[in-house]
Each structure stands twice: as structure tokens, then as C-alpha cells.
Amino acid sequence: MATSNSTNGQNRDNVKIGMAVDIVLKEDQRIGKLTRGIVAELLTNSQFHPHGIKVRLQDGQVGRVQSIIN
């Protein structure tokens, strides 16, 4: 499992509306391309998701949080 200096996006408690995050869009999952944006809505109801909490960004894009920008 890869580790980084950024906060874990797998735990819902770590992800808040208004935060800057890097997400991976559904269509970019295979290549791992990240998209940066501001969280507008949390879409995952569970407290933990192994692939990242699903969010909608302010620009409407939806993906799973890979890292939280400090």
C-alpha cells in the first residue's frame, strides 16, 4: 500500500465540504490521473471506503478522494 504525506481520503471524517482534494474520476481509474478541486458534497455514506470517499467537486465532477491538500 502506497503512503504519502497527505491526509487519508479513505475515512469520511477526514473529508469536509470546502476542502481542496485530489480525486480520481471513474474514467481515469485505470490510468490513475488525478483531478484537483474543492469538495461541494460527500456522496459516500459509509465511514470508510478502501478506494476513497466519493465526492462531488464544486465544478460538478465526481470521483474518489485520493489525497487531501493541506
Predicted regions and their residues:
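Basic/aromatic-rich interaction segments and small domains that mediate binding to polyanionic partners
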Residues: 2-70
